[in-house]
Structures are given as structure tokens and as C-alpha cells.
């Protein structure tokens, strides 16, 4: 029991020490963090555009009509099944709420 208590105490003191260091660094880095936050949306947008372009190029290179037809067929069948089961689920919920 004593070793667990000492371990817990050590971890608490370690976390508190990092909190004190972190609060001092936050005051120093506020200007830098604001600039970083301003750059973040721009970099995310550029990464998203690059990823979209890469996927589009890959799709154009590997386009097969038979695969495309199969994908469209699977999508239509699965969306029909999902809408059917969603309707059944909705009816069940309404029946439970009304108490019929």
C-alpha cells in the first residue's frame, strides 16, 4: 500500500510541476500561438485541396465502367434497405411513444 501511495503522490507532484511550467510558457507563447492559429485553417484547407486532387486523379486513372456500375447498383440497393429499416425503426419509436 505504501508504494502505491508514493507512486500516486509522485504522479500528482509531477503533473503539478508541469502545470506550473505550462502556465509560464503560455504567457510567453501567446503571440506565437495566435499566429499559429491563424495559419491552421489555411494549411488544413490546402491539405484538403491536395487530397481531393490526388483522389480525383487516382479515380480517373483507375476508372472502370463495370466497377462503376456495380458501385452504383450496390449504393441504390443499400440506400433502399436503409430507408426501409429507418421507416420501420421510426414506426416502432412512434408506437412506443404513443403507447398504442
UniProtKB/Swiss-Prot annotation:
GO terms for biological process: lipid catabolic process; lipid transport; positive regulation of phospholipid catabolic process. The keyword Secreted applies. This is Apolipoprotein C-II. Residues 1-22 form the signal peptide. Belongs to the apolipoprotein C2 family. Residues 66-74 are annotated as: Lipid binding. GO terms for cellular component: chylomicron; high-density lipoprotein particle; low-density lipoprotein particle; very-low-density lipoprotein particle. Pfam families: Apo-CII. Component of chylomicrons, very low-density lipoproteins (VLDL), low-density lipoproteins (LDL), and high-density lipoproteins (HDL) in plasma. Plays an important role in lipoprotein metabolism as an activator of lipoprotein lipase. GO terms for molecular function: phospholipase activator activity; phospholipase binding. Residues 78-100 are annotated as: Lipoprotein lipase cofactor. Keywords: Chylomicron, HDL, LDL, Lipid degradation, Lipid metabolism, Lipid transport, Secreted, Signal, Transport, VLDL. It is found in: Secreted. InterPro entries: Apo-CII, ApoC-II_dom_sf. Gene3D superfamilies: Apolipoprotein C-II. The keyword RNA-binding does not apply. Proapolipoprotein C-II is synthesized as a sialic acid containing glycoprotein which is subsequently desialylated prior to its proteolytic processing.
Amino acid at each position: 500500500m505504501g508504494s502505491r501511495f508514493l507512486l500516486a503522490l509522485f504522479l500528482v507532484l509531477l503533473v503539478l510541476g508541469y502545470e506550473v511550467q505550462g502556465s509560464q510558457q503560455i504567457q510567453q507563447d501567446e503571440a506565437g500561438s495566435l499566429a499559429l492559429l491563424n495559419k491552421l485553417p489555411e494549411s488544413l484547407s490546402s491539405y484538403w485541396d491536395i487530397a481531393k486532387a490526388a483522389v480525383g486523379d487516382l479515380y480517373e486513372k483507375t476508372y472502370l465502367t463495370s466497377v462503376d456500375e456495380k458501385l452504383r447498383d450496390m449504393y441504390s440497393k443499400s440506400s433502399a434497405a436503409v430507408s426501409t429499416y429507418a421507416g420501420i425503426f421510426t414506426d416502432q419509436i412512434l408506437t412506443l411513444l404513443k403507447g398504442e
